[in-house]
Amino acid sequence: MAIRQHVGALFTDLYEVTMAQAYWAERMSGTAVFEIFFRKLPPGRSYIMAAGLADVVEFLEAFRFDEQDLRYLRGLGQFSDEFLRWLAGVRFTGDVWAAPEGTVIFPNEPAVQLIAPIIEAQLVETFVLNQIHLQSVLASKAARVVAAARGRPVVDFGARRAHGTDAACKVARTSYLAGAAGTSNLLAARQYGIPTFGTMAHSFVQAFDSEVAAFEAFARLYPATMLLVDTYDTLRGVDHVIELAKRLGNRFDVRAVRLDSGDLDELSKATRARLDTAGLEQVEIFASSGLDENRIAALLAARCPIDGFGVGTQLVVAQDAPALDMAYKLVAYDGSGRTKFSSGKVIYPGRKQVFRKLEHGVFCGDTLGEHGENLPGDPLLVPIMTNGRRIRQHAPTLDGARDWARQQIDALPPELRSLEDTGYSYPVAVSDRIVGELARLRHADTAEAHPGSNVVGAKAKRP
């Protein structure tokens, strides 16, 4: 069973609470629709894998300001006692629709929708965006690494290089979601039910008088183990594994050797040759050391006999694309569409649905439509929560998300599965109804800005 650290309602930005008090003072309690989406793909990404929904659902179900939170807010001197008394009773009572975790999404497509009284939806913005953004970035990187490995196991080794303990656990989770075999991080494994993997450190070998003695001690305690062979000299370390095999005879059950430095191309081939000559064809080769999807792809293209990969730094920080232009924006309030016309940041108004078309099992195009439209394709967004409680049949599970993610990757056009930039842009159309509503709101905005002109149009409501 998952065991997670609780994050309280105070994980929010100050302006969320100041806006909440202003809404409260103005008696604004209408239903708002907020959507999370990103505007453009970062370099080196042809899609984004949506993730983080499970943590969002858990947070929303437990949302409340406790006494310590309220005491702190009172001490800021910006909030009235009456408002804080009211805030103490606030819970998330809204609905959530989302693309299930593991879904592949593209620019301007909502990953998550929150439909709730505006104060509730505003107060949860920081946490919701934090989790969807972080975990989607990490899952997208992991999906590329897993794809590069071509079915060989990939293991998350990155906890010590992650940006904090929470991020380390999220890396383990999203990597597994995206297809990794498991993690070395025990806390994450316990929290999320992820398989664990581990070898040994160079320090263990160094602590013994000889490398052979270290290998023998470890193999005696953990017979079906993996031995790290590059502490002093990689090929000499391989010879010591062979020596150990001769000494133990039928009791030798070492499953793999790990290469963690040097020219992995040359060393993996030499290691395989020595092991095979010694009759140890069953001993696999596991590689680590600064790997990412491009290095893994290059090693396999060179026919390196590597059977699995441990990936750390590049996985946990997604160094080539560590952030998304992801936003949490109001698209409707009190039954009316909302938008903004800032340069380069126009928002499509209204609650939306994404319709995805397939041909012969391959995604061939999406259409962004209004919620309730009936357009060709399968709708991506499904109900996750209603009235503040999760819908069990749609509640995200990690194993379910992992299976779904694999299906999503398998259905991508070949151009999007490629690690290289093929120049192919996945088509995302916008329905006529959304385009028409955006034009209507723009017309109304122009009329408001120039009241003496001859422009006529309905005046858009302002939030």
UniProtKB/Swiss-Prot annotation:
CDD domains: NAPRTase_A (cd01570)
The enzyme's E.C. designation: 6.3.4.21
GO biological process: NAD biosynthetic process; NAD biosynthetic process via the salvage pathway; response to host; response to hypoxia
Alphabetized UniProt keyword annotations: Ligase, Phosphoprotein, Pyridine nucleotide biosynthesis, Transferase
GO molecular function: nicotinamide phosphoribosyltransferase activity; nicotinate phosphoribosyltransferase activity
Modified residues (Phosphohistidine): H202
Protein name (database record): Nicotinate phosphoribosyltransferase pncB2
Native species: Mycobacterium tuberculosis (strain ATCC 25618 / H37Rv)
Induction text: A member of the dormancy regulon. Induced in response to reduced oxygen tension (hypoxia), low levels of nitric oxide (NO) and carbon monoxide (CO). It is hoped that this regulon will give insight into the latent, or dormant phase of infection.
Name of the gene: pncB2
